[in-house]
């Protein structure tokens, strides 16, 4: 069986048995510092076999940080694969064994310097279902206070303050195209209009959060 169960994976419905593809065997075709590329032989619903190539990803989180006046914290950073500076909400990948909320708190503090008192899990998205196991948990954060940030070596990030209306205008103009940020905006708009329910919690402060 596969050893790379994706974040957010759920059991298939029995009604979908006629669509299911079953694992036969796996081969690692590339392993870099970050990417793990697999080629799996799979059995199709009709009994024939074929291959699926995909990237194994540890999973990630994204934070929608809300100031008390309703404005939002965003980042601008250069994304080499698309060769442009992207406007995004803070995000980062999970460390091995790290709970998603711990990761969200860590990434927000490291990248922006902000800490949040209250957190709410908005949901999860799978952003590249044809070729990656990556799942991104989206968290809302409020009750922000600004401290110092601690960027990783080789990380260059500008932090800015904006509004949801401005982000929606940027998306409509085609200057904001990051999928996780677009989904976070959509869920935030729905939450503000009482169409997206979340549960707020007050976890221990970052330095008090137990490490796995």
Language-model regions: role of each:
Residues 188-201:
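Short helix-capping/linker segments at secondary-structure and domain boundaries
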Residues 46, 67-69, 78, 142-146, ...:
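Short loop segments at secondary-structure junctions
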Residues 50, 59-62, 93-179, 198-212:
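Unchanged
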Residues 2-7, 13, 17-20, 52, ...:
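Conserved Nudix-box catalytic region and its N-terminal flanking loop in Nudix hydrolases
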Residues 25-62, 68:
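Acidic, metal-coordinating catalytic segment for phosphate/diphosphate chemistry
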């Amino acid at each position: 069986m596969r050893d790379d169960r994706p974040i957010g994976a759920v059991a298939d419905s029995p009604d979908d048995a006629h669509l299911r593809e079953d694992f036969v065997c796996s081969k690692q075709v590339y392993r870099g510092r970050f990417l793990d590329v697999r080629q799996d032989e799979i059995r199709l619903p009709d009994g024939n076999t074929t291959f699926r190539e995909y990237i194994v990803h540890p999973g990630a989180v994204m934070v929608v940080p809300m100031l008390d006046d309703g404005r939002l914290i965003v980042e601008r950073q250069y994304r080499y694969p698309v060769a442009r500076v992207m406007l995004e909400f803070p995000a980062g990948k999970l460390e091995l064994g790290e709970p998603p909320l711990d990761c969200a708190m860590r990434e927000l503090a490291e990248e922006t310097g902000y800490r949040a008192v209250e957190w709410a899990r908005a949901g999860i998205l799978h952003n590249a279902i044809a070729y990656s196991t990556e799942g991104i948990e989206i968290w809302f954060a409020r009750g922000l206070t600004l401290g110092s940030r601690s960027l990783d070596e080789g990380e260059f990030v500008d932090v800015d303050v904006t509004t949801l209306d401005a982000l929606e205008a940027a998306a409509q103009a085609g200057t904001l195209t990051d999928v996780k940020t677009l989904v976070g905006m959509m869920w935030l708009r729905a939450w503000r209009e009482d169409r997206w329910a979340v549960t707020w919690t007050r976890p221990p402060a970052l330095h008090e959060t137990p490490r796995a």
